[in-house]
Amino acid sequence: MEKLRESLHEAPIIDKDGYSYLVHPLSNGVPMLEPELLREVVVGVTRAADLDVDKIVAPEAMGIHIATALSLQTDIPLVVIRKRSYGLDDEVPLHKTTGYSESEMFINDIEAGDDLLIVDDLLSTGGTMAAICEALDDIGADISDIVVVFRKQGESALDDTDYDVTSLLDISVDQDGVTIHD
């Protein structure tokens, strides 16, 4: 994870209303995402994840590129949990609350009994992931594994659940930069 570690130390930190916000290619799309970094991350996820699944699931938006590359590498189909409704017959809405917003997301193409790997870029407050897991459970799908690239230190909405999340790196962010916790 050498390139991933280097990229964190090079990433800008901006202040958003008193919140130290990491701007990183994997979690924000800027600065540009170098293929070497994406490749390293996908290899890391491949090694960390249970790949004996029916589908890879990723929330829109920043988990998509990681999950797409993983799907291409593993030949496992990809389902994107979207921010927009298309009104399709099998669409399942979910409500998510994060540390800074509330919104709806929409699930299609997941059925009871599907074994799933959830992949995302960042776990911060856990609000998005908790809402996704609850909705997938309600459908009757089996969450085999959850892997994120970065997990921010601190309380998470997943703390009081039975869901285990594997992260490639645990981090904390403040105005001075990113600290990697090994």
From Swiss-Prot:
<dbReference type="InterPro" id="IPR050118">
    <property type="entry name" value="Pur/Pyrimidine_PRTase"/>
</dbReference>
<dbReference type="Pfam" id="PF00156">
    <property type="entry name" value="Pribosyltran"/>
</dbReference>
<dbReference type="GO" id="GO:0006166">
    <property type="term" value="P:purine ribonucleoside salvage"/>
</dbReference>
<dbReference type="GO" id="GO:0016740">
    <property type="term" value="F:transferase activity"/>
</dbReference>
<protein>
    <recommendedName>
        <fullName>HGPRTase-like protein 1</fullName>
        <ecNumber>2.4.2.-</ecNumber>
    </recommendedName>
</protein>
<keyword id="KW-0660">Purine salvage</keyword>
<comment type="similarity">
    <text>Belongs to the purine/pyrimidine phosphoribosyltransferase family. Archaeal HPRT subfamily.</text>
</comment>
<dbReference type="InterPro" id="IPR026597">
    <property type="entry name" value="HGPRTase-like"/>
</dbReference>
<keyword id="KW-0808">Transferase</keyword>
<dbReference type="InterPro" id="IPR029057">
    <property type="entry name" value="PRTase-like"/>
</dbReference>
<dbReference type="InterPro" id="IPR000836">
    <property type="entry name" value="PRibTrfase_dom"/>
</dbReference>
<comment type="function">
    <text>May catalyze a purine salvage reaction, the substrate is unknown.</text>
</comment>
